Structures are given as C-alpha cells and as structure tokens.
Amino acid sequence: MDKKSARLRRAARTRHQIRHNGVHRLCVHRTPRHIYAQVIAPNGSEVVAAASTVEVELAKDLKGTGNVDAAVAIGKVIAERAKAKGVSEVAFDRSGFKYHGRVKALADAAREGGLQF
C-alpha cells in the first residue's frame, strides 16, 4: 500500500464516523502549493462555506500560499464564513493528513475564529 492510498483509507474511515454523528464537517486538503478548507453539510450534499489560497483576494495578502501563515489565514476566513452561514459547531476532517504543521495551524485558527470542534 502506497502513501496516498493509506491516507485515503484513513480519510474514508474518519468521514464515515463523522457522517454517522450527523454534524457539519470542516474538511481540509493540502497540496505543496495550496491549502483548501470546506464546511460541508451533515448529509454531504452541500458545501456551506469554502476558502482556499487559490482565491485571488486571499492570496494577494499572503507572502506564500503553501506555508503555515497561509493556513492560519484560511482558518480565520473559513471560521468567519461558516459563522456567517450560521454554523458554529463542526467536526474536523483532516482528510487523512497528520495533525501537524499546516493542518494544525488551520484548525487552531478556526477555533480562534469561533468554530467549535
């Protein structure tokens, strides 16, 4: 089993547990160049809020898009957008990535922004 399939297996297991709980989930995806965050409805059919470093308005204020500072900025923005839609409590879906570095920075910034995990 290679690294990617192991990560996807971990992600599927986590998503199944979150869907069983029936709460909104904050889904994070990272690439070497960008980081993405989405708040997804409990049934999985609707994206309630989204933010990423691909967005020109967010990326122009950042020094780089693939670093911890960018993840912190995305965490703050996703918390703000989710709260504007009436979502304050989410389950954190790290998509099989280690809870470390950029993923942890995004989660901490979202908590500081008012989201409860």
UniProtKB/Swiss-Prot annotation:
Organism placement in taxonomy: Bacteria, Pseudomonadati, Pseudomonadota, Gammaproteobacteria, Chromatiales
Family according to the record: Belongs to the universal ribosomal protein uL18 family.
Pfam family of the protein (one): Ribosomal_L18p
UniProt KW keywords: Ribonucleoprotein, Ribosomal protein, RNA-binding, rRNA-binding
Function: This is one of the proteins that bind and probably mediate the attachment of the 5S RNA into the large ribosomal subunit, where it forms part of the central protuberance.
Domain of life from the UniProt record: Bacteria
Recorded GO CC terms: cytosolic large ribosomal subunit
GO process annotations (BP): translation
PANTHER family associated with the record: 39S RIBOSOMAL PROTEIN L18, MITOCHONDRIAL, LARGE RIBOSOMAL SUBUNIT PROTEIN UL18M
Residues in the signal sequence: none
Summary of subunit composition and partner proteins: Part of the 50S ribosomal subunit; part of the 5S rRNA/L5/L18/L25 subcomplex. Contacts the 5S and 23S rRNAs.
Gene Ontology MF terms in the entry: 5S rRNA binding; structural constituent of ribosome
Classification via InterPro entries: Ribosomal_uL18_bac-type (IPR004389), Ribosomal_uL18_bac/euk (IPR005484)
Protein name: Large ribosomal subunit protein uL18
